Amino acid sequence: MRISGAELFVKALKEEKVDVLFAYPGGQAIDLFHALYGETDIKVILPRHEQGLVHAADGYARSTGKVGVCLVTSGPGAANLVTGIATANYDSVPMVCFTGQVPTKLIGNDSFQEVNIVDITKASANTQLLLKGEKIWLKL
């Protein structure tokens, strides 16, 4: 049975026992939010801003010992995570942040809300991945 990448994303979160997701919707991540809609195993926390979101995930991880998990859209949504990612990383707080991205064929073409978040976070995060296409999901 084929499932969408968004459905696979939700399935992976559940398999990793993520029960709280700090998330702010936007165009390039909207399919992920549709897949999360009605999901009862994952509580989605919707803050007023991505910067608040990432710091809330950091605080959640510090207070519970669990991984703080974030989901935002591309461009400014992703860029707004940088300070919180750096804070968590420098204090060895476990955090995983997912961002949307423009369509693969538009990467590098200065398209609307495109930000090279992989390069931006190289100095402040342990690992960065840009998933292109369905085959890479199967390798993870």
Where are these regions (language model features)?
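N-terminal alpha/beta PP-like core and its mobile active-site loop of ThDP/TPP-dependent enzymes
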Residues: 1-140
